[in-house]
Amino acid sequence: MTEITGEMRTAFREQGFLVVPAVLSDEQIAAGRRVVDGLLADQPIADGQVGPHFLWPRFGAAGHPLLDFYREVGVAALAGQLLRSDLAVSDPDFAQVATTIPPWPHRPGGPHVDGLTPCEDDGRPSTFSVLAGVWLTDQGQRHRGNLWVWPGTHLRFGRYLAERGADALRRIDEMNPGPYPKIELGAPTQAVGTAGSVLFAHYLLAHNIGGHDGTADDDRRETIYYRLQASGHRQRWRTVVTDPLIEFRA
C-alpha cells in the first residue's frame, strides 16, 4: 500500500492539498477509464463541445462501478493516513466524473467552496472532510485541465468561520462570487502529477477548475472525485469548519 509520510502530512496540513504519486497501476488506470467511457456512453459529450463535462453518479443499494473502483484503488485506506487514527473514512454515496475537453484556454477568475449551492434539505451545508481526486490522465504539465488551488486558504477560511460562527458558512450573500469568503487568497498554483496519482484537498481549500490549452487532438482530462467524510463528521461539522485541522493527524 502507498504510504503517506509525515512530511507529506505536514504539507497537507500547511498547504491544504497533497498529490500522492503512483497510487494506481496501469491496469487500474485502464479499468477506471473503461468505467468512465461506459458512463459517457449513456451521457455523452456533445459533438464539438469543449471545456468541462461533469457526471454525478449516485451509489444505490445495489452498488456502482465507481464505488467498486474506489474500493479497488484503496482510496479510503490512503485518505485514512491523513486522518486521526481514531477516525475512519465513511464510504461516499456519489462520485463526480470530471472531464475537460480541449481546446479550452480558460483561467479561473476566483475560487469556490463546495456544498453551499444548494445546501442539504435541512439547511446544513454539504461539508466533508477531504476531497479525493483520482487522476486517470496525465496532469504533469500545467494548463491541461489541472485543478487550481490557493494554498493555505483552508486555515484562513477556518479563522473566518471561527470569528463569525460556523453558520456564516451558509451566508453566501456575505461572500465573493464562487462562493468563497472575502479573505486573503494569495497566489494560486496548479496541481500537477502523472496519471495514477491521487489528489487530496481539504474541504475549505479555495479551488477551481482550470483550462486545457491542448489541441482538439489531445487527450481530454479525466478525474474521478470522491467527497469523503471522516466518521461522525455530520454531527460535528460546526466544530470541523471552525477548527479545520481537528480531523487530521499531525
Language-model regions: role of each:
Residues 1-14, 21-121:
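Non-heme Fe(II)-dependent double-stranded beta-helix
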Residues 19-20, 134, 199-201:
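Short hydrophobic-aromatic micro-motifs
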Residues 107-116, 167-185, 214-218, 239-242:
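Short, surface-exposed loop/helix-turn segments at secondary-structure junctions
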Residues 119-142, 192-195, 227-230:
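Short, conserved beta-strand element in jelly-roll/cupin
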